[in-house]
């Protein structure tokens, strides 16, 4: 009721049916609409790395992709949003590090001057502690990882997501600014490709670009002759990309040395930069950069 609106008489009040929703005289309070506001952070490009299923080497791709960006002098952040199974700190040899808290701001762990990392693993008392959270708590944590971590000015934030298309993917897509799209990781097998196509469809439904598809474990590098052997088949990732008319970013062979490097906490592209696997990762990174730069160009 405004100051110019006369108050209702007792006779009018006595006619109230008790149904405010259908009453023309009831004051309507507008309900909030739309998605939650974007977190205000100084990040030029947010890149999501996800897969339809687990065990395809998604985190390995994310670590080496972020490292490749940092090696090129790009200010890069790596955000581990696999809240229930964080593995990024182990793969970078920083699992014993703990982020400092200064002036109500969390400092990410610096791997190199160009690579900053934040993970749920840093906040757990030990590696065997489970995270038993539902959706709202995970969304709150993701918001904190974006808004309360002192990322500084970043060229790229690479986000390693859990397998599938659950709360974490929805939350980061809603909260993060400048999401340039998603890199979908799969292996050549039909089962993995089937789930990868679901991830592609999900990203498109979120109205986000699919930067492209990476086929990981595409053949295997022989530890003796270093030739790439067709062990698990090839071409599944390329077929998935063609089916949905999205870019194919390249294939990365399975390399036992790459597995050992991850267990030792060293990104493989730094440990053995001349190997076929490291060169394949560099090719994928160059294709990701090209896709983002093309998307960022102003239209004629």
Language-model-detected regions and their locations in the chain:
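Phosphate-binding/switch loop-helix module in NTP-utilizing enzymes
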Residues: 124-172
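Phosphate-binding loop that captures ATP/GTP phosphates
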Residues: 76, 81-128, 139
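Cysteine-cluster motifs in flexible loop/terminal segments that predominantly coordinate metals
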Residues: 2-37
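Glycine-rich phosphate-binding loops of nucleotide-dependent enzymes
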Residues: 118, 142, 161, 174, ...
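Phosphate-binding P-loop
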Residues: 38-44
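C-terminal boundary of histidine-terminating zinc-finger modules
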Residues: 264-275
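Conserved catalytic-core segment of NTP-binding enzymes
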Residues: 155-261
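Walker A/P-loop phosphate-binding motif and the immediately C-terminal alpha-helix
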Residues: 45-83, 200
